[in-house]
Curated annotation (Swiss-Prot):
Molecular function in Gene Ontology: ATP binding; ATP hydrolysis activity; polynucleotide 5'-hydroxyl-kinase activity
Signal peptide start and end residues: none
Name of the protein described by the UniProt record: mRNA cleavage and polyadenylation factor CLP1
Chief location of this protein within or outside the cell: nucleus
Compositional bias (Basic and acidic residues): 437-478
Organism in which the protein naturally occurs: Cryptococcus neoformans var. neoformans serotype D (strain JEC21 / ATCC MYA-565)
Listed Acidic residues bias regions: 479-494
Renumbered residue ranges of the record's region Disordered: 437-500
Family to which the UniProt record says this protein belongs: Belongs to the Clp1 family. Clp1 subfamily.
Function of the protein: Required for endonucleolytic cleavage during polyadenylation-dependent pre-mRNA 3'-end formation.
Amino acid sequence: MAEQQTTELTNIDLEAGSEWRFELEADENIALRTLSSDPVFINSQELTPSAWYPIYRHTKSALYAPTSARIQVTNLPASHYTSTSTVQPQLLNLHLAMERQRILSKRGMEQRGPRVMIMGPQSSGKTTVMKNLVNLALGTGMGWTPGAIGLDPSSPPNLIPGSLSISTPSHPIPTHHLAHPLGSPPASTAANTISGDVETASWWLGALEPTNKNAEVWRVLVEHMAEAWGMRCEKDKIANISGLFLDTPAAFTVPTLGTKKDDPKARYTLVSHAIQAFDIDTIIVIGHEKLHIDLSRLPLVQSRQLNVIRIPKSGGAVDLDDHDRETAHIFQVRTYFYGEPPLPPQISSLVGKMVSLDFELSPYSFQIPWSRLVVLRVGEENSAPSSALPLGSSKILSPLRLTRVDPSGPGHVVRLLNRVLALVDVKPEDRIVPAKESEVKEEVKEEKNEKDGEIKQDGEGEKKGEGKGEGEGEGEGKDGEEEGEAEGEDDEEEVPFREEIGTREVMGFIVITAIDTFARKYTVLSPTPGRLPTTVAIAGAIEWVDSA
C-alpha cells in the first residue's frame, strides 16, 4: 500500500520590503496563501487573500511584501530564504514613468505608449522583469493591454521553444509553472483561469537562438511581427496607448551577432534592426555594464535619443544550467499538447479556496501519408553544399530558400523523428507548381473518408473526428506506392510553394512521433482532433519525446 503523503503547513512572517524566495526541485510542489490583510505579490500579481495558490515543481520565484505580512506554505521546499535585497523599487519607478507616458498618450499629449526592449545576459531575469512590468501595467485598473513581444525562442512566453510570439494579456499573469511565463494561449477547451485565454500570434524560427546563419530569416520574422503589431495598433487605440515590452535573447549581447560581410565593423545589428522595426524608445539593460555603455554609444540610439537604463540583476535570479533549460523546454512542449498538469493530491485536498487552473487537454495521434504532409526547411544552411555543384560553378541562393525534406533519406540527414513542426497557412496564390493528378485524387479520397467519420488513433482503433482522412486508407494499395516511387527524386526535391510561406505566422504545432518507411506514412501528434488546418509544415531543430 502506498504511503499517504501528509501536508505540513508553515507560517512565514515577512518584513516590509522583503522577499521570500524559493527554488522547487523535481519532486516538490507547494501551495501558499496570505494570512494578513496587507497585500503580497508574486511577480507583481497580488495574491487573492486566503486562497491557496499552487506552484509546480522546478519553479523558481519569489513573493514580495511591500508591508509586513504573513504567508502560509505547504511542505516547505528544500531551498528557500527571505531577503531584504530586492529590485522591486526600481521596477516600480520604471512602471511609474511608463504609466505617465500612457496617461499622456491617452490625453493626446503623446503619440503612443512606451515601447520597451529588455536586454541582458543569460539567466539575468529578463523574462521576470518583463512579467513584472506587464503585471504592474495590468494592475492599474486603467484597462491597459500592453503587447508582450517574445523574441527569445529559448524562453518562449506562451508557446513552445523555437517560437517567437506576440500576446496581449488583459489580466495579471499568474506564476504557477514553467510553461506559460506570460500567460497561456487559447486552448480547445474552455479556460477556467482569468488569464487562460491570452491572445497570441506566433512565428517559427525553429532554433533556440538567432545566429549568423539564420540572421536573415530572423530579420524577416521580426519585420513580420512588427508589421502585425503595427496593424493591431491601427485598429486598437488602447493597444497603441498601452505600449509594448520586448523580451530579447541572450545572444543579443554579442556585438558581432548578425554582422554582414559587406559591413564587418557593424555592431549589434540585430538589436538595431529590432529597435527600428518596433520603434523602441527605451532600452532596459539588466546588470551588464559594458552592454549598457555599448548600446548608449550606438549611432541609432543616439540619433533617436533613446533612453538606455541599467538596473541591477536581482539577487534572486537563478543561474540555470543546460539541464534546467532542457527540463523547461520539455515541460513547455508537453503543456502545449496536454495542457496544464493536474494538482498533486496533497495540494488538491487542502481545505479552503483554490486558485483554479486550466483543464487537461487530450491530444490525438494519427497517421498521414508522406505525399499528403509537405515538410519544408527554411534557410540556406539546409541546401546542398557547394561541393555538390559542378566544377567551376557557385550557388547563389536566397537566405529564405525552402528545401523539401525527403523522409525516405538517411535518418541522420532527414532528422524528422520527434521533430516539432510548425503548420503554416498556404493560399492558392502561394503555389508555384501545379498540383499533380495523384495529389488531386488523394485530396478527393481524403474528403470522402472524412465524410465517413473514421479516425485511427494509437491504441484505440477507429474513432470519429480525425478521419482516416489525412490521406490514409487501404485503397491506396501497391499502385499508390509504386506511383510515388516512380515519380522519383525530383518530386521530393521540388518545392511547390513560394518562399514567403516559410516566415509566415503559424497556425499551430505538431510532432512526428513515428515514421513508417514501408507504408510511407508519418505518425503525428496533434493538440486537437479533426483534420489538420493545413498540410504544409516547417521543420526546425526542436525535438520532443513524449516520455511521460
